Amino acid sequence: MMAIFGAKNPHPQSLTVGGVTCVMDLMDPARMGEYMSKFAEIKEFVDRAYYPDILMAAKAYANEPSVLNDVGVSNLFCYDEFLIGKNDHLFKGGIILNGDISKVYDIDENKITEEATRSWYKNDKALHPYDGETEANYTGLVDGESIDGEGKLAHSKLFDTKGKYSWIKAPRYDGMPMQVGPIASIVINYAKGNERVKKIVDEFLTKSGLPLSAVFSTLGRTAARMLEAKVVAEHTMDAFNALIENLKTDQETCTKYAIDNKKEYKGNFQGNAPRGALSHWCRIKDGVISNWQAVVPSTWNASPKDAKGQMGSYEACLVGLKIADLSKPLEIIRKIHSYDPCIACAVHVMDTKGNDLSTYKINPNL
């Protein structure tokens, strides 16, 4: 659907290489009709398939301990998302601490840091993204025993959980781990009294018979993703109509800028991606980018421990989990899948016996 107005997709819609959004396409009745037709198909799927399926699952697993007994990290973080009117977002941003929905805090970007105490990077200090460093420092695996494919203990190479063990950094807000994603958007907006969200959430809770506290679970994360889709499906046309109204008075497709090579600049983007809170932080010096750091949703959720020993949400939700068959730990997969992981940039193929698979030399100047 994005490609209808923005040329190639998936590609950045703001760069010439990937295609530039064309105002005339937005004003073309045929293009608008195509968009609305495809949107109607998506809304029908959400209403008639996605919602009923999750409702059925909620009822079926309402008393399943491995589904419900999972808090993980109960600090929630989301940004404003989907502008549907002047200063009016479909989802409002904010922060909830310790699962307490009686208070939603405003976001202070100065409190965001990343550290690498347990990550394979050199500088362990908690740094603001503007000052972030990403210089690799792979320290290897350690000898030990682990469960093999038959569910038995066997000699293996293991992650050094007392040292560095991940390619993912540890983002923190005011020194605390956060959980991001649809669960954060839904709970924070419910707590803020966002009627667009409250109406749909209350209806689902009534039909499923679940309490609001059930959202802090594997089932809750899965349901929150559906509820977010439901809210978006109900109000997409509000955003679309607001865009059309805006085009009647403003047809600019870009903001011109000029870089003075004698000055230094810094700027950021903070917003929500489908998997949660996303931010990019850039410094410019001597007319070129001197530092660029991205703090992405799965980094928040999949982060390793920090210097205080605090776990990220993936790790925290697995503590105490009972595994029925050690050779097939489906319970672990179920929980992690509920976060919808996107960690391609942090996944490295490793041999559990410690053998090098291949070696690559990278020229950073190319």
Task: Identify the function of each model-found stretch.
Residues 1-275, 296-366:
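Active-site bordering "gate/hinge" segments
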Residues 278-296:
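Short beta-strand elements
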